[in-house]
A protein has these predicted regions:
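Catalytic metal- and UDP-sugar-binding loop of GT-A-like glycosyltransferases, i.e.
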Residues: 10
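Long, low-complexity, intrinsically disordered cytosolic termini of multi-pass membrane proteins
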Residues: 122-150
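Short, glycine/charged-rich "phosphate-handling" switch motifs in NTP-dependent
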Residues: 6, 18-19
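A short, surface-exposed alpha-helical micro-motif characterized by mixed small hydrophobic
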Residues: 1-2
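Charged, flexible cofactor/metal-binding loops and thiol motifs
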Residues: 21-123
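Intrinsic disorder/low-complexity signal
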Residues: 16, 103-104, 136
């Protein structure tokens, strides 16, 4: 806090939050920034700090997830987070955050993203089921060709 004028918080090589040091410390917006700050030890043993414990899968930097890179560990995760990478929003002067929670356009269209995610999940489940069937039956292609000829 006393070393720099500005802070940039990154996760898997992506900017999550950026701004003036005092603003970020006083008003962290991104769930990852909040979790980081909650892990900072406080020298006062009487001070009660609420720790944010991150759970969920830590994604591979070589194969990051679709959408927000933090969604696999975020307690605020919504369907849109799994689909779209968030835009950088200037929440207040010189305080930028990449989180759908602060994007009015996205927040006003959550139902659309919920439906789209359900459709994508259904399609993925059907594809997985077909692949499992094909693995069970090594002769699936021959059977498919015979059925097709009939």
């Amino acid at each position: 806090k006393y070393i720099t004028d500005q802070i940039l918080v990154m996760y898997l090589g992506n900017m999550m939050e950026y701004g003036d040091t005092d603003e970020i410390f006083d008003n962290p917006l991104h769930p990852y920034t909040k979790a980081l700050f909650s892990a900072v030890p406080v020298p006062n043993p009487d001070a009660k700090m609420e720790r944010i414990i991150l759970s969920g899968d830590i994604p591979s930097p070589a194969n990051p997830p679709k959408g927000c890179k933090f969604h696999t560990r975020c307690k605020e995760c919504m369907s849109v987070c799994k689909m779209l990478e968030p835009k950088y929003i200037e929440h207040t002067k010189n305080h930028f955050v990449a989180c759908h929670l602060y994007n009015e356009e996205v927040m006003n269209n959550l139902a659309k993203y919920d439906e789209e995610l359900k459709r994508e999940e259904h399609e993925a489940a059907v594809k997985k089921a077909l692949e499992e069937e094909m693995l069970k039956d090594k002769n699936w292609f021959q059977k498919w060709m015979i059925k097709r000829k009939k």
